[in-house]
């Protein structure tokens, strides 16, 4: 029998319903795995007592044949989803001891469906990063190692703890957030399915804000079917979130295994020119194209002419929104407060924010404040918003001709911890292929599609028009079926 912590969400639900094992046994198997691999630093707060209590309640529900859609399934939550009575830090010193008195919309939805929370996962501070190295709790180590090198690798960011937890079999699924690629890029680096829904599909209520017009909850799983199951539980209108879309929750599981014959899939190969993509990833892109052709899809060459400006646009808009959102952390209302004798209010603000924020967060606050200043707002912020509209228009034009778009999730495989740390611009380019869809608010997924020559996982990204999560899953399922001979599992786990 497969180890319980290695079961998928779907297989776990099946086993629980058939009384093959209990939720408590399932949770204990995950706790054992978490304890075994603490060196990866995937979790910052463990909630084992809560998980065991929820598991007992789940087992009682199964005994009475009254189970809900996620009854007894162990999951983890990125530490920017507020959890009532449980520390929520966004991995920043300024919120290190913050305990919210309310529950985020997404975690509440999962609890309402019977989910069991194992803990809160590590992340880049305030979700600002691409390697999970800016956390106040230290960096996360990927469960993966290259075949030719035993060096520790990054799991990607900012949702690196969630990616490491699911990849290392320390959670069946894990919540992440995706602002410019923070679910899809880590999923690519760790061999997972990482899904970002349409902007507004999932409630942002109770999510610690980074960039409000871009932030969206996402999910890490080890299969496309699991992704559809979790999404159906997460999605839903929330009147407490002004950006929440008021629509019925779609039925997504029927997309799995559905034929893609006759689907038109757009491929913007011109985005791969100029040597920015590693050869292994270019090879995977072409092999995935052939795989989809064999499955009956029609491949169409398309152009996204403004996508190349995505990174520049993002690093104006996101820091601008962050500088506004993070102004609330002033040492007065909640969070860290640093005081000294005879200190003025201005000095308290300065010392608190200097002590509470890390270097990357300070960098982005300063960039954001600069581009919003009266002297430069027209030149940077307003111009960036105009180009953002052009990026979205490119996608709209493409979707007039195609049903889905195929792109790599990242231009590189996972890299060594510390390798790109001293050059922020190189780090920012990791989100080259994920940012455009975020700027347009589109649903997208990273699905494992190959291994590099060094044995590291590589992800392909599927993007569809707004609210078309169904076809995203449909194409992702076809890719998954085409590479089922590849084992996306780190050695030793």
From Swiss-Prot:
GO molecular-function terms, A-Z: ATP binding; glutaminyl-tRNA synthase (glutamine-hydrolyzing) activity
Gene3D superfamilies listed in its UniProt record: Amidase signature (AS) domain
Keyword Methyltransferase belongs to the record: no
Stored InterPro entries: Amidase (IPR000120), Amidase_CS (IPR020556), Amidase_dom (IPR023631), AS_sf (IPR036928), GatA (IPR004412)
Catalytic activity: L-glutamyl-tRNA(Gln) + L-glutamine + ATP + H2O = L-glutaminyl-tRNA(Gln) + L-glutamate + ADP + phosphate + H(+)
Gene Ontology BP, a term: translation
Alphabetical list of Pfam families matching this protein: Amidase
NCBIfam families reported in the protein's UniProt record: gatA
Family indicated by similarity: Belongs to the amidase family. GatA subfamily.
Quaternary structure note: Heterotrimer of A, B and C subunits.
Protein name listed in UniProt: Glutamyl-tRNA(Gln) amidotransferase subunit A
Species name: Rickettsia bellii (strain OSU 85-389)
